[in-house]
Protein backbone atom coordinates (compact mmCIF):
# COMPACT_ATOMS: atom_id res chain seq x y z
CA UNK A 1 0.00 0.00 0.00
CA UNK A 2 1.50 3.29 -1.13
CA UNK A 3 0.02 5.19 1.80
CA UNK A 4 1.70 2.85 4.27
CA UNK A 5 5.05 3.08 2.49
CA UNK A 6 4.82 6.87 2.63
CA UNK A 7 4.76 6.69 6.44
CA UNK A 8 7.85 4.49 6.72
CA UNK A 9 10.53 7.20 6.86
CA UNK A 10 12.80 6.86 9.88
CA UNK A 11 14.55 9.62 11.79
CA UNK A 12 18.02 8.28 12.57
CA UNK A 13 18.87 11.46 14.48
CA UNK A 14 16.49 10.31 17.23
CA UNK A 15 18.68 7.35 18.27
CA UNK A 16 20.56 9.08 21.09
CA UNK A 17 17.45 10.90 22.21
CA UNK A 18 15.58 7.60 22.31
CA UNK A 19 18.15 5.84 24.49
CA UNK A 20 18.24 8.70 26.96
CA UNK A 21 14.47 9.05 27.06
CA UNK A 22 13.85 5.32 27.53
CA UNK A 23 16.14 5.44 30.58
CA UNK A 24 14.11 8.39 31.92
CA UNK A 25 10.86 6.48 31.42
CA UNK A 26 12.25 3.46 33.26
CA UNK A 27 13.17 5.66 36.21
CA UNK A 28 9.81 7.43 36.23
CA UNK A 29 7.79 4.20 35.98
CA UNK A 30 10.05 2.31 38.39
CA UNK A 31 10.76 -0.55 36.01
CA UNK A 32 13.58 -2.05 34.01
CA UNK A 33 12.56 -3.11 30.52
CA UNK A 34 13.64 -6.43 29.08
CA UNK A 35 15.97 -5.92 26.08
CA UNK A 36 13.28 -6.31 23.41
CA UNK A 37 10.87 -4.03 25.30
CA UNK A 38 13.58 -1.39 25.46
CA UNK A 39 14.27 -1.83 21.77
CA UNK A 40 10.59 -1.35 20.95
CA UNK A 41 10.21 1.86 22.96
CA UNK A 42 13.42 3.29 21.48
CA UNK A 43 12.35 2.32 17.96
CA UNK A 44 9.11 4.26 18.34
CA UNK A 45 11.16 7.48 18.56
CA UNK A 46 12.53 7.10 15.06
CA UNK A 47 10.25 4.76 13.09
CA UNK A 48 7.42 6.15 11.00
CA UNK A 49 5.64 2.80 11.26
CA UNK A 50 6.47 -0.10 13.57
CA UNK A 51 4.97 -3.46 14.47
CA UNK A 52 5.00 -4.91 17.99
CA UNK A 53 4.02 -8.55 18.33
CA UNK A 54 4.00 -11.04 21.16
CA UNK A 55 1.84 -13.64 22.84
CA UNK A 56 0.05 -13.37 26.20
CA UNK A 57 2.28 -12.33 29.09
CA UNK A 58 5.15 -11.06 26.95
CA UNK A 59 4.83 -7.46 28.13
CA UNK A 60 3.05 -5.78 25.22
CA UNK A 61 1.00 -3.56 27.53
CA UNK A 62 4.04 -2.44 29.52
CA UNK A 63 5.81 -1.68 26.25
CA UNK A 64 2.85 0.28 24.88
CA UNK A 65 2.76 2.36 28.07
CA UNK A 66 6.43 3.13 27.48
CA UNK A 67 5.75 4.16 23.88
CA UNK A 68 2.90 6.41 25.03
CA UNK A 69 5.24 8.03 27.58
CA UNK A 70 7.88 8.49 24.87
CA UNK A 71 5.44 10.17 22.49
CA UNK A 72 4.25 12.43 25.32
CA UNK A 73 7.83 13.50 25.98
CA UNK A 74 8.20 14.22 22.26
CA UNK A 75 5.15 16.50 22.49
CA UNK A 76 3.08 14.45 20.06
CA UNK A 77 -0.71 14.27 20.13
CA UNK A 78 -1.62 10.61 20.57
CA UNK A 79 -4.66 8.52 19.67
CA UNK A 80 -5.21 4.98 20.96
CA UNK A 81 -7.53 2.65 19.08
CA UNK A 82 -8.60 -0.99 18.85
CA UNK A 83 -10.97 -2.93 16.59
CA UNK A 84 -13.61 -3.71 19.24
CA UNK A 85 -15.22 -1.85 22.12
CA UNK A 86 -13.98 -4.45 24.57
CA UNK A 87 -10.39 -4.17 23.33
CA UNK A 88 -10.57 -0.37 23.40
CA UNK A 89 -11.88 -0.38 26.97
CA UNK A 90 -9.11 -2.71 28.08
CA UNK A 91 -6.50 -0.58 26.31
CA UNK A 92 -7.83 2.51 28.08
CA UNK A 93 -7.76 0.83 31.49
CA UNK A 94 -4.20 -0.44 31.04
CA UNK A 95 -2.70 2.78 29.66
CA UNK A 96 -4.69 5.35 31.62
CA UNK A 97 -5.58 7.13 28.36
CA UNK A 98 -8.81 7.23 26.40
CA UNK A 99 -8.97 4.61 23.67
CA UNK A 100 -11.72 4.19 21.11
CA UNK A 101 -12.74 1.76 18.42
CA UNK A 102 -11.26 2.30 14.97
CA UNK A 103 -14.80 2.69 13.61
CA UNK A 104 -15.57 5.48 16.06
CA UNK A 105 -12.19 7.10 15.41
CA UNK A 106 -12.92 7.24 11.69
CA UNK A 107 -16.52 8.42 12.13
CA UNK A 108 -18.02 5.32 10.52
CA UNK A 109 -21.63 5.50 9.31
CA UNK A 110 -23.88 3.36 7.12
CA UNK A 111 -24.92 4.97 3.84
CA UNK A 112 -28.42 3.67 3.09
CA UNK A 113 -28.42 5.02 -0.46
CA UNK A 114 -25.11 3.45 -1.44
CA UNK A 115 -25.61 0.45 0.85
CA UNK A 116 -22.07 0.72 2.14
CA UNK A 117 -20.02 1.93 5.08
CA UNK A 118 -18.68 5.47 4.81
CA UNK A 119 -16.02 7.21 6.86
CA UNK A 120 -15.99 10.83 8.00
CA UNK A 121 -12.20 10.81 8.37
CA UNK A 122 -10.49 10.48 4.98
CA UNK A 123 -7.72 12.13 2.97
CA UNK A 124 -9.92 15.22 2.73
CA UNK A 125 -10.58 15.37 6.48
CA UNK A 126 -7.71 13.47 8.14
CA UNK A 127 -7.19 12.74 11.81
CA UNK A 128 -5.44 15.45 13.81
CA UNK A 129 -3.27 12.94 15.70
CA UNK A 130 0.50 12.96 15.26
CA UNK A 131 0.84 9.40 16.61
CA UNK A 132 -1.64 6.53 16.39
CA UNK A 133 -1.31 3.28 18.36
CA UNK A 134 -3.59 0.39 17.38
CA UNK A 135 -3.92 -2.68 19.60
CA UNK A 136 -5.31 -6.14 18.70
CA UNK A 137 -4.21 -5.70 15.09
CA UNK A 138 -4.77 -9.37 14.31
CA UNK A 139 -8.51 -8.58 14.43
CA UNK A 140 -8.28 -5.78 11.85
CA UNK A 141 -9.20 -6.65 8.25
CA UNK A 142 -7.96 -5.13 5.00
CA UNK A 143 -10.92 -2.78 4.47
CA UNK A 144 -10.71 -1.21 7.94
CA UNK A 145 -6.93 -0.91 7.84
CA UNK A 146 -7.08 0.77 4.43
CA UNK A 147 -9.63 3.25 5.75
CA UNK A 148 -7.37 4.03 8.71
CA UNK A 149 -4.37 4.65 6.46
CA UNK A 150 -6.39 7.01 4.28
CA UNK A 151 -7.27 9.05 7.38
CA UNK A 152 -3.66 9.60 8.49
CA UNK A 153 -1.79 12.79 7.68
CA UNK A 154 1.67 12.46 6.09
CA UNK A 155 4.25 12.14 8.87
CA UNK A 156 1.88 10.53 11.37
CA UNK A 157 3.62 7.87 13.45
CA UNK A 158 1.85 4.53 13.44
CA UNK A 159 2.39 1.73 15.98
CA UNK A 160 0.57 -1.54 15.32
CA UNK A 161 0.36 -3.99 18.23
CA UNK A 162 -0.91 -7.55 18.35
CA UNK A 163 -0.28 -11.26 18.49
CA UNK A 164 0.63 -12.63 15.06
CA UNK A 165 -0.30 -16.14 16.25
CA UNK A 166 -3.82 -15.11 17.25
CA UNK A 167 -6.79 -16.08 15.08
CA UNK A 168 -7.10 -13.70 12.11
CA UNK A 169 -9.88 -11.17 11.59
CA UNK A 170 -13.34 -12.25 10.47
CA UNK A 171 -13.15 -9.93 7.47
CA UNK A 172 -10.95 -10.30 4.41
CA UNK A 173 -7.19 -10.52 4.82
CA UNK A 174 -4.77 -11.32 7.62
CA UNK A 175 -3.30 -7.82 7.67
CA UNK A 176 -1.04 -7.99 10.72
CA UNK A 177 0.64 -11.29 9.82
CA UNK A 178 1.04 -10.17 6.22
CA UNK A 179 2.75 -6.95 7.31
CA UNK A 180 5.15 -8.91 9.53
CA UNK A 181 5.92 -11.42 6.77
CA UNK A 182 6.59 -8.62 4.28
CA UNK A 183 9.70 -7.60 6.26
CA UNK A 184 9.22 -4.08 4.92
CA UNK A 185 8.34 -2.63 8.32
CA UNK A 186 10.42 -2.47 11.50
CA UNK A 187 9.11 -5.24 13.76
CA UNK A 188 9.86 -6.10 17.38
CA UNK A 189 9.06 -9.63 18.58
CA UNK A 190 8.41 -10.01 22.31
CA UNK A 191 9.06 -13.65 23.18
CA UNK A 192 10.03 -13.64 26.86
CA UNK A 193 7.06 -14.55 29.07
CA UNK A 194 6.98 -12.74 32.41
CA UNK A 195 5.37 -13.93 35.62
CA UNK A 196 2.12 -12.15 36.44
CA UNK A 197 3.61 -10.87 39.68
CA UNK A 198 6.15 -8.96 37.63
CA UNK A 199 3.36 -7.19 35.72
CA UNK A 200 5.13 -7.95 32.45
CA UNK A 201 8.25 -6.07 33.45
CA UNK A 202 11.10 -6.46 35.86
CA UNK A 203 10.06 -4.34 38.82
CA UNK A 204 12.86 -2.77 40.71
CA UNK A 205 13.16 -0.70 43.84
CA UNK A 206 12.88 2.87 42.64
CA UNK A 207 14.35 4.34 45.80
Give residue spans per PLM region:
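Conserved ATP-binding/catalytic motifs of P-loop helicase motor domains
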Residues: 1-207
Amino acid sequence: CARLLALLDMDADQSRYAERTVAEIEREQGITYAPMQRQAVALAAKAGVMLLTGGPGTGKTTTVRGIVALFQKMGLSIVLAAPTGRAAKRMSELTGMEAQTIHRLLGTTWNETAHQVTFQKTEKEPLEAEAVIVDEMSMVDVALFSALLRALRPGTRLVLVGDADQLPSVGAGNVFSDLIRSRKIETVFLREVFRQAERSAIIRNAH
